Amino acid sequence: MIIYLHGFDSNSPGNHEKVLQLQFIDPDVRLISYSTRHPKHDMQHLLKEVDKMLQLNVDERPLICGVGLGGYWAERIGFLCDIRQVIFNPNLFPYENMEGKIDRPEEYADIATKCVTNFREKNRDRCLVILSRNDEALNSQRTSEELHHYYEIVWDEEQTHKFKNISPHLQRIKAFKTLG
């Protein structure tokens, strides 16, 4: 089972395309939708939905994937639910760059302070990070500097922030899932 979390643009047709691409790894791909506008509510909702899916799951190696803001959530929810994560161009600093787009961006900073201390150290090697060198929305170099101590970083030379085509990375993702 692969759980997919969309980014800020929840209505993007690219979400459906990524789900179809992920089905080459596992036919059981589940999209969880969330508001993107209310961080604390989103965290509760995502934890509850992922937990529900894991209770009914028969896959011994489930995976959670997310793009952009979905990557922010996939890393945290995956850690809390003890499943491996794959994150594409994760938005690690939504409290800095989502001002005016969501109701309470400061809640992201609050969530960060309430998260498990040194959670990335405890999550070491359980997350695969795929970054675009052509990310027009986020500073991928800053993201790499933040995460490379804990996780493998894979660089993509072609895609932009929304990562429309993940197919060149499917074999790597499949191998990572199999390690689960």
Swiss-Prot record:
Originating gene: ycfP
GO molecular function: hydrolase activity, acting on ester bonds
Recorded coiled-coil stretches: none
Bridged cysteine pairs (disulfide): none
Protein name (record): UPF0227 protein YcfP
Source taxonomy: Bacteria, Pseudomonadati, Pseudomonadota, Gammaproteobacteria, Enterobacterales
Family: Belongs to the UPF0227 family.
Gene Ontology cellular-component terms listed: cytosol
